[in-house]
A protein has these predicted regions:
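Hydrophobic, lipid-facing positions within transmembrane beta-strands of outer-membrane proteins
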Residues: 10, 21, 40-44, 174-178, ...
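Transmembrane beta-strands of outer-membrane beta-barrel proteins
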Residues: 23-25, 57-59, 190-192, 274-278, ...
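Surface-exposed beta-strand-turn/loop segments characteristic
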Residues: 1-259, 263, 270-271, 275-277, ...
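Structural signature of Gram-negative outer-membrane beta-barrels, strongest in the C-terminal barrel
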Residues: 283-285, 290-305, 405-497, 514, ...
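Carboxylate/His-rich catalytic cores and anion/metal-binding grooves
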Residues: 364-403
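Residue-level signature of outer-membrane beta-barrel architecture
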Residues: 48-50, 180-182, 265, 269-271, ...
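Flexible glycine/proline-rich, aromatic-decorated loop/lid segments
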Residues: 15-20, 487-508
Length: 524
């Protein structure tokens, strides 16, 4: 009731020194004890009067850089510990060290297909090194990954995922602020504010893990592992599933650029014992997040199914996919640059959110009671929000391994009225230096969901200068924000543990999870 429905997680109160005069600068340099996460920050502030003191100007600029901390910079990430299912027991877990994912940079065989179960298992656990050289895959001390595409292991040949993800993201931040107020009349002051901020951050996402179905007649397999092809033929195995970390171009990375612009104009007027303030604010946020080295799933499926045509290795489905390039998955560094160009892409995502706010409020004292003046604040506010998201065609078709943000557009308006009363009840008596009651009410009308009311009733008992008791009861609402209402959907990959009795006990990696908005949400 006191702060409004947009006060979702509490209100950050700050005081702007509107009368600052002079010059101030700050420089901060630091780093973590480990010698990383270097931080550099500098700011300047200037304030001055003009036109014989009727006007005042304040300017501030800030620039900050944080180098961040990568996961491989800490032993806790290099030797990550976690709970994994006890091998052979789906109801118990053990705490294991050196946790790794079963995916490898050159790939290894999960299981065969087409033959008997026993024959399929005979080609399991073959790892491909540089040039396609075969060696046994080391499943580590403890493993839930044998013969499955999911799970974790302790030690062995798996990939330490924790080393590839930042503990602290690298960040660059720029801020500019300008404010001026001018006294037109003795009881009338106009003011204007403008601000600009830009934040740039790079984030390393999860490594590019993926599964491939390799046919026995794969052209690259025949080149690098003819003995394996012969063995598969003898066993009646027609294909196998292998996993792979495609890191030839590095990790999948998000490059965030977040810009905010804000303008505010308004006036303060003194009407006898009453204060009246009215303002209009416009703000916009532009955020773009290109994601580089993002795997295009359908293209990888086409590229990995390679055959020989006219003496050249090409995708089997080349006729249906002009421009496709065959991908050699056997061993780190084996794919050609042309193949990487074909299966990797850059996700394009941009969002613009605009907000307009008109606000007016009057504060003052209605009359004086024996314990002091009865203070009141009444006002109204109009807010309009609009958001538009744009993405590339592949994302819109959910074609990438990560993100796949869907384009959307949505808007809504809110009209609110509020009133608050501060009522002095007792003053300067035994055990009561002051007792004050507080009443507040707010009505909001949402263009998406209709009316909502909130209220608050409270009391403050000031026993003495150093002891205060406070009690309150309120009806509060939490309104959905514009993303929760209109977001079309964003896909992320998660790990899901099967902890149900009688379940597999495995951790399933890379499970797609879609988060989307709901226009039918109402304030709660």
């Amino acid at each position: 009731a006191a702060y409004g429905s947009d006060a979702v997680g509490g209100v950050v109160n700050f005081v702007l020194n509107k009368e600052f005069t002079g010059f101030k600068s700050d420089v901060v340099v630091g780093q973590a004890q480990k010698g990383d996460n270097q931080e550099y920050k500098g700011s300047v502030t200037y304030g001055t009067d003009y036109l014989k003191g009727r006007g005042h100007l304040i300017f501030n600029a800030e620039y900050a850089v944080s180098k961040g901390v990568n996961g491989d910079g800490r032993a806790s990430r290099r030797e990550e510990t976690n709970q994994i299912p006890e091998p052979g027991n789906t109801t118990k877990t053990v705490r294991a060290t050196d946790i790794r994912s079963p995916f490898t940079t050159g790939g290894h065989i999960i299981n065969g297909a087409g033959g008997t179960a026993a024959n399929n298992a005979q080609i399991r656990g073959i790892k491909f090194g540089p040039g396609g050289v075969q060696s046994p895959y080391d499943y580590g001390k403890l493993s839930t990954t044998v013969g499955t595409t999911n799970g974790f292991q302790s030690g062995g040949d798996g990939f330490r995922i924790g080393t590839s993800q930042e503990i602290v993201r690298p960040l660059t931040r720029k801020n500019l602020f300008l404010r001026s107020d001018f006294k037109l009349l003795d009881h009338l002051t106009v003011f204007a504010e403008g601000s600009y901020s830009e934040t740039m951050a790079d984030q390393q996402n999860s490594p590019t893990t993926h599964l491939l179905t390799i046919q026995r007649g794969n052209a690259f397999l025949a080149q690098v592992a003819p003995d394996l092809v012969a063995r598969m033929t003898a066993l009646g195995v027609t294909s196998f599933t292998m996993n792979r970390l495609t890191l030839e171009r590095g990790l999948t990375e998000s490059h965030v650029n977040d810009k905010n612009r804000r303008l505010l104009v308004g006036f303060n007027a003194k009407l006898g014992e009453w204060n009246w303030e009215t303002s209009y604010q416009w703000g916009t946020n532009d955020i773009s997040i290109p994601i580089t080295n993002n795997l295009i799933l359908a293209r990888m499926a086409v590229a990995a199914d390679a055959v020989v045509v006219g003496g050249q290795i090409v995708p089997r489905a080349l006729a249906a996919n002009p421009g496709a390039v065959a991908f050699n998955p056997f061993g780190a560094g084996s794919p050609s640059q042309a193949a990487l160009d074909y299966v990797m892409g850059t996700t394009s995502f941009a969002e613009t959110t605009t907000q307009d706010v008109a606000d007016t409020k009057i504060t003052g004292n209605l009359f004086t009671l024996p314990a002091g003046p009865l203070a009141v604040a009444v006002g109204a506010q109009w807010r309009s929000l609009k958001s538009t998201t744009r993405s590339d065609a592949t994302s819109a078709a959910a074609g990438y391994r990560l993100a796949n943000t869907q384009p959307f557009s949505g808007d809504y308006t809110i009209i609110e009225e509020f009133a608050e009363f501060q009522i002095p009840i007792i003053k300067d008596v035994f055990l009561a230096k002051q007792v004050t009651a507080n009443l507040a009410a707010r009505h909001a009308n949402y263009s998406t969901s209709g009316d909502a009311e909130s209220w608050k009733a409270g009391m403050v008992w000031q026993l003495q200068s150093d002891l205060r008791l406070r009690a309150s009861r309120s009806r509060d609402i939490r309104a959905p924000n514009i993303s929760e209402l209109f977001t079309a959907g964003t896909q992320q990959n998660s790990n899901i543990d099967d902890t149900f009795p009688g379940g597999t006990g495995l951790t399933f990696q890379g499970v797609p999870r879609v988060t989307s908005g709901n226009p039918n949400l109402k304030p709660e």
